[in-house]
Amino acid sequence: MNKIVLLGRLIKDPELRHTENGEKAYTKFIIAVERSFKSADGARKCDLIPITIWGKKAEVICKYMQKGSCITLSGRLRTGNYEDKDGNKKYIAEVIAEDFKFIGNRKEQNEVVEG
C-alpha cells in the first residue's frame, strides 16, 4: 500500500498549468510540514514536500489557496529519476495528491473546502 497523509502550509501561491495538449489541468506546489520534535536548539524544523494534483481539484486549489494556506492532503508517493543537463543522475520524490481539505485562507479564515 502506498498512502501518505500530510498537514502543512503552502510556501508560495500555486499556479494552474495544463498538459502540452491542453487537455488536463494540474498544479505543482510545495508544502512545509512541521516535524513533531524540536531540534537541539529548541526550534521546530519543517520538511518541504513537493505536491502534484490533477484535474478539477487542481483548479480548486489554485482558486482558493495561496502562500500560507493550511492544507491536509492524502495521496501516494511517486519516485523517479532523470539526467540533468550535465549528465548527472537526479532522483526525485513527490506526493501525487488525491484528496485534500483546507480551512480558510487569508481572505476568508472560516471557510472549509474539500476536494
Regions found by a protein language model. Give the residues of each.
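Short, acidic/hydrophobic/Gly-rich beta-strand patch recurrent on exposed beta strands
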Residues: 28-33, 50-53, 93-96
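A short glycine-rich, His/Asp/Glu-containing loop-to-beta-strand
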Residues: 3-7, 25-34, 47
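Beta-rich strand-turn-strand
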Residues: 54-90
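Acidic, gly/ser/pro-rich intrinsically disordered tails
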Residues: 1-3, 15-24, 38-44, 63, ...
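Short, charged/polar surface micro-motifs in flexible loops or helix N-caps
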Residues: 12-14, 36-37, 56-59
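The conserved catalytic core of RNA pseudouridine synthases
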Residues: 43-53, 60
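Conserved positions in beta-strands of structured domains
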Residues: 11, 17, 54, 78-80, ...
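OB-fold and OB-like beta-barrel modules that bind single-stranded nucleic acids
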Residues: 5-10, 31, 67-78, 100
